Amino acid sequence: EGGDDFIAGNPVTYFELVLKLYEGATEIEDTKFYFKNGLSLGLDPGYDAGHYNQSAALLSRLVAEDQGVGLAVNAMEIESINDVVIPLEINREAGETFRITVDTFDIFGGVQVYLEDNQNGTMTHLNLEDFVLTPEIALGGVGRFFIHFTQSVLSTQENMSTSHLNAYKLNNQNFITIE
């Protein structure tokens, strides 16, 4: 008798989105977002993962209680997928054209994903198109770029601002960092 591991009606327990940064056809970096019940917008040990290279081309940050660590994996409560803004860190040299695209989009219908560039005042609807930029100056740190997950279709005409300041102190340092 053969067995089948498929269980009818077994609910999906998490959703995933992977963003990738490319220069031309070359993939440079990716960052992952997971949404699962029981997680928070802060650090969830065993789920959130800091990037081994804090100067990597593409990182995200915690939405709550950010302590200045760039993440390769950012895991959040499943309900957050309906309305959350996540700081994104892009580290690129001036004059180097790059694009950010959605690679994996394992998220239920109706969720819209936008990349905000608050310096240029743009909202790129990543469900429909890639974000492309040739920076005039080197990019680094947080505060300019954000990923928006929402159930609404946003317009670049809307006055959306995510001017955030992050302040944190690492345990082994004698100073506070403000970004």
Identify the meaning behind each predicted range.
Residues E1-E179:
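Compositionally biased Ser/Thr/Gly- and acidic/asparagine-rich
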